Amino acid sequence: MDLVIGRVAKAHGVTGELVVEVRTDDPDARFVPGARLRGRAPRGGAERAFVVESVRPHGGRLLLRLDGVADRTAADALRGTVFLVDSADLPPIEEPDEYYDHQLEGLLVRTVDGVDVGTVAEVLHTAAGELLSVKTPEGAEILVPFVTAIVPRVSLADGLVEIDPPEGLLDLE
């Protein structure tokens, strides 16, 4: 299963640098000079291999220079490209209460009282911490802080995320 670790937001300057939105918790290991990246063009386009020439932080994103991308025109052509890794290549997680995003996505969300709320659509990484974006059967989105006080139990074996929501968290009105 392919996992997105970054996405090209736009070109930066005239020398081929790219502004990359990071979608991995370990950018220092994935986006380093000499690293090989697998990229896929937007809307199911062709895959292509890239080699990182340089990288530097840029306001919560990265400025990336790739081998063979030497000017703004080449950089603009990569807008929307996503960088991928295969989930089988990820190291196992040693901590019992830590998960890869893809392990949580699709799990059933149920309250401690046994009420089904919906399914985890995605995990959002914010400055304040992680949020579970839960899609209800009606199609609404509920954002659940992914903290032990609200999410006391995750069972990958049972395909279940159990939540103990504070008053008002599940109110959609």
From Swiss-Prot:
Subcellular location: Cytoplasm
One GO-annotated biological process of the protein: ribosomal small subunit biogenesis
Keyword annotations from UniProtKB, A to Z: Chaperone, Cytoplasm, Ribosome biogenesis, rRNA processing
UniProt main location, coarse: cytoplasm
Keyword Acetylation in record: no
Gene Ontology molecular-function annotations: ribosome binding
NCBIfam families assigned: 16S_RimM
Family of this protein: Belongs to the RimM family.
Assembly mode: Binds ribosomal protein uS19.
Domain statement: The PRC barrel domain binds ribosomal protein uS19.
Role played: An accessory protein needed during the final step in the assembly of 30S ribosomal subunit, possibly for assembly of the head region. Essential for efficient processing of 16S rRNA. May be needed both before and after RbfA during the maturation of 16S rRNA. It has affinity for free ribosomal 30S subunits but not for 70S ribosomes.
Entry protein name: Ribosome maturation factor RimM
